[in-house]
Each structure stands twice: as structure tokens, then as C-alpha cells.
Amino acid sequence: MDKKKLYIFLDVDGVLNNTSTFRLNRKTMYVLSHENLVAYQFLIDKSMTKYDVKVILSSTWRMYKTGINKLSKFSKKYNGLVLCGKTPDGVDYREVEIKDFCDNHNINYDDILIIDDELIDNELKKRHLRTNCHEGLRFSDVMNWLEKEGIK
């Protein structure tokens, strides 16, 4: 039996990094936090027990080769960074870009997870795991979402 698909719309800043990461790496905007990456990969690994996980990059990193290359480099260690797509480069609010992506690809809103530190305030908000930009994605965020999804 095929697993149900789960499309994860991934933001990077405020999810896979945090304010401490930026303070320690002032030379570049494209930084990742080991702690946040480990929490994210744990979410991916656990989610894959129930779902066929597809990661869509919704971060502004999608618009810059430097950002895409950084994620690609880390994808060798963290398979949760293997991307199957990205939202179109647009000027709309993130939730509008994600909604349009879903509509254009016939993706049911119940089959998505948006991991983002920005507020999602439309019909997608019930599928939003909101992080805190100061801390990024924490294990407590991951555990709460896994429990909500019935994943052990």
C-alpha cells in the first residue's frame, strides 16, 4: 500500500537557523544551525514512517543560488534537505504563494505542513508549524507536531 504524501513547505531563516546563528556568523546570511537541523531531520525521519515526504522550498533562499547551493551541500548529511520543488519566485505573502503552489499542483491542503516563523493566516493555518525566529525549530515543536499527527 502506498503511503499518503506529505508536502513540507520549508522556510529556512527562523526555522533551520536562529538569531544566535546569525550572531556567530556575521560574514554571511546563509547560515544553518546544527541544533535546528537535527530537530528538522528528526521530524523528517519520523514523518517518513507514516508519509511519503516531499520537501518544497518556500524560503527566500529559493531565489538565490548561494542559498540553494548551501542546502544542497547539507543534503548529503540531512536527507530532509533534498528538495522536490520550490514555490515560484513571487512577491505575494508566503501563504498565498504556498496556496497557489498547492492549487497549481492539485495538492490537498490537508496533505501539507508549513514550517515557518512567519504568521500564516489563511485556510492553511491549521497545517502550520510556527517556529520562533530567535530559537528556530526546536525538538518541542517537532514533538508537538508528531503527537498531533499520531506519529510515535
Over which residues does each language-model region extend?
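Catalytic phosphate/metal-binding cores of nucleic-acid and nucleotide-processing enzymes, i.e., regions
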Residues: 1-152
